[in-house]
Swiss-Prot record:
The lineage of its organism: Bacteria, Bacillati, Bacillota, Bacilli, Bacillales. Belongs to the GerPA/GerPF family. InterPro entries: Spore_germination_GerPA (IPR019618). One of its GO terms (biological process) is sporulation resulting in formation of a cellular spore. This is Probable spore germination protein GerPA.
Length: 73
C-alpha cells in the first residue's frame, strides 16, 4: 500500500542488514561465515576466568565449499 514517509535518518546498517521502505515481495539477506576457535573462546559475562594451559585449534578444511548458498555471488 502506498504511504507518505517523512524524514529518515540512517545511522548505520550492518553488512548483512536490510533497509526497506515501501512494498516488497521478498526480502532475503544472505550471509555466511566460518569461525575456528579454541578452548576459552566466545566466553561472555562478568568476571570470566579461563585457564587453558595447553590449547591448540587444528584446522584442516580440505573442501572448497562447506554448504552452497543459492543466490550468493
Amino acid at each position: 500500500m502506498p504511504a507518505m514517509v517523512g524524514h529518515i535518518r540512517i545511522v548505520n546498517i550492518g553488512s548483512s542488514g536490510i533497509f526497506h521502505i515501501g512494498d516488497v515481495f521478498a526480502i532475503r539477506p544472505i550471509s555466511y561465515s566460518r569461525a575456528f576457535a579454541g578452548a576459552g573462546s566466545f566466553n561472555v559475562g562478568d568476571n570470566v576466568s579461563v585457564y587453558n594451559y595447553q590449547s591448540a585449534t587444528t584446522v584442516n578444511d580440505s573442501d572448497v565449499v562447506d554448504q552452497a548458498i543459492i543466490g550468493s555471488t
